[in-house]
Amino acid sequence: MKLTFNINYDTVFGEEVLLNIVETDSKGAKKTSQFRMNNRDGKHWWYELNRKEATLNTSLDYYYSVDCDWADSRHEWLTETHRLELSAVKGREYTVYDHWADVPEDSYLYSSAFTECVNRRPLPSIRPSAYDKTVRLIVRAPQLRTFEQLAVVGKPKSMGAWDVFKALPMYEHNYNEWIVDLNVETLDGEVLEFKFAALNTADTQHPLWETGMNREIHLPEIKNGEVVVYELSQAFFDICNRKLAGTLVPVFSLRSKTSYGIGDFGDLKKMIDWVAVTHQRVLQVLPINDTTTTHTWTDSYPYSCISIFALHPQYADLRQLPPLKDGKKSNDFEALRQELNALKQIDYERVNDAKQKYLHEIYQQEGKEMLKSKAFKQFFADSEQWLVPYAQYCYLRDKYGKADFSTWPDHQVWNEKERKQLSTPSSKEYKEVEFFYFVQFVLNQQMEAVHAYAREKGVILKGDIPIGVNRNGCDVWMEPKYFNLNGQAGAPPDDFSVNGQNWGFPTYNWDEMVKDGCKWWVRRFQNMNKYFDAYRIDHVLGFFRIWEIPSDAVHGLLGQFAPSLGMSREEIEGYGLHFLEDQFTKPFISDWIIDRVFHERAAEVKQRFLNHTHDDIYELKPEFSTQRKVEVAFEGKTSDADIWLRDGLYALISNVLFVRDRKDPNKFHPRISAQFDFTYEALYDSDKAVFNRIYNDYYYRRNNQFWYREAMKKLPKLVQATRMLVCAEDLGMVPDCVPWVMNNLKILSLELQSMPKDPHVRFGYLGSNPYRSVCTISSHDMPTLRQWWDEDFERTQAYYNSMLYRGGAAPHPLPGWLARDIVGRHLMSPSMLCILSVQDWLAIDEKLRLADQNAERINIPANPKHYWRYRMHVSIEDLMQNTDFRENVTELVCQSGRE
């Protein structure tokens, strides 16, 4: 069978267009074969491919790319490639006319969030045609809704003679891509004139015509047995952009009458029911990966995962497991369940201990048979790459009583040679770790079932991908080459934390990751695709540059962006600032600073912690020269006076004007937020002005193009690794290059009215939100709406008058009717998604919401040791039965057009 591919693409000397055929082997692995195309004039490219092995009713997926001698090659959008169906019974030769496909503006409509949840239409099998001569039309129409089908109508009688009710129906052979084969013998003349129409399968009397002029194709001479394929430009219809509403709630925060003191995957199903019944379409959760390092409450931090693949055992729905045969044990577990479920907050340690014991009991009772099942064998085959190392890591962590593998007596790094023994059921090593296989199998089955259930209900499950991983976790243990362990990831100062955030995660070795095409990240995203149809990239700024903090620092103020372009002494002095290296890069400590920080304890501080150097200048004693040393010195001291003293010493240590580059000791970076510190205060006014210019150039201009290129090395591969809808958390110190990249890749931004991206306004204007965005009132890192309302009365008053357009004094606490008004305004915004926390939804009902608004806070970012234990005070069953609240939410959603 002869296949000829044609595409018009303007090139310059040195550029070549390549045809890339994508084939899938028996194991599901994709292999791409490249063919250099021929060229007549630098614009028209073609390639003739002979496929002896081609068979009827098969298809070929392919895309085009451009190879270039002097720059990176580029390729088409890969989320949906071209597809050629070999479905013509008499077809011996296919001639294809394609056009180049970049990322479309409406790429979100091709995401599984829309194709599998919102506009769900099952793809039919290939439909053969049996014409002697065939013209095939292929067109994309992503706007079509679930109940619509594309049809073509044209001038020839065989195409309906412009009677739309006699139009030829097309079929969807790929997501949002429709196809029809035409018999050339029934077409009139050499010019084919036609148009597309959307037919309502439920209401056939009101078809919808595509916009624009009639389409025309000048038909070539077509031989018997030839199929000429035209891929046409997208069909557009007068259909409004879809807007959807949703709820954000961590899985652990869910409460049902039958849960085990913490939300689980069974509760998640129940929450999907509530979301669906209130006409919402999105349910967003926080990360659900395993975080277990100490088996204590400090493991409650969901963003510190030990494995990017493994799910947390605490989310196992024990109700779905076979009942315990031991009646006494069963009764004991039930009594404990009722006790834990009655608690207002999560008791992380007791809950996890109880669930682990129950899982062990079920494993002893049922594990042998479950691990013989076909389902387990398939799961193991699909997951072996990460599952085997994870299981051994968990076994060794528990055996040695600590997760810090660098202190283990053996196995300080994963040994690939041990995989075979750990994968052989008859081996001793397998027996040691098979419990962890069992638990992950149970969790995977339950979460996949939740995902399928959400799709059936038309609800988009939205997950969360943390930017970091635990430095003592399995991922670092297994593949240390991908991580830098000589620093800590965090965030610069922002509205959440004046000292910045230190997450303690290792930073990524992007040079190593990019070498293999970011396979580690691609595997991560593809694994997440099993459970979700949309995801939030936590701290997307980390893909441009990460805030890297020295290992000996506690706060984030001494960090620097990595990678970034540091400044030489000569560059700094070129601005007009005489560079005093010792004074600017070492803590500047003088009498007046000590007095300002420590007041009446100044003399004590000088004696205990400082050495006098000259005049009124001091330096820290060697044993207190870093924040980590100070932290160790004050370990166990918890009085307010001791904490105040410790924090004062932290402030002295971070009192520098520049920090030295982490790789090049001759390069420097302006210290973040230095203008609020004493070393800046000590400068002459003229030097302050110069430093401000250096600071603004460095943070807002100098690195823009550099960071843009860094992000474009990584993000395109990741967002096109799956068909999930991509959303980003782009808050904080956002350089100009971030919206450039997000717009190129069509990533949804996050919009909060209380944290506007425009630095010139106090509150964002909801009507200015871009369509491609997620609108919310508060995130898990922020106070809830009710807390925010009472935090700062002056700010609230300004918001009440200027944004809600109400006169008089703002009422406190926030009344339900006013919370409803605020929620309604957010729902009316242009944003594609409006996802509100469950606490903010509950705020509209004074009878239902929690009396203590401060008990609703999920996380306080300024506190790295925060206990994540918030739990809904009302059960999902009660939410479902509360008719008034359910109808209230439904009315708000429907009035905003977000059904």
Mark where each language-model region is:
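Boundary detector for helix-to-coil junctions that initiate low-complexity/charged tails
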Residues: 96-100
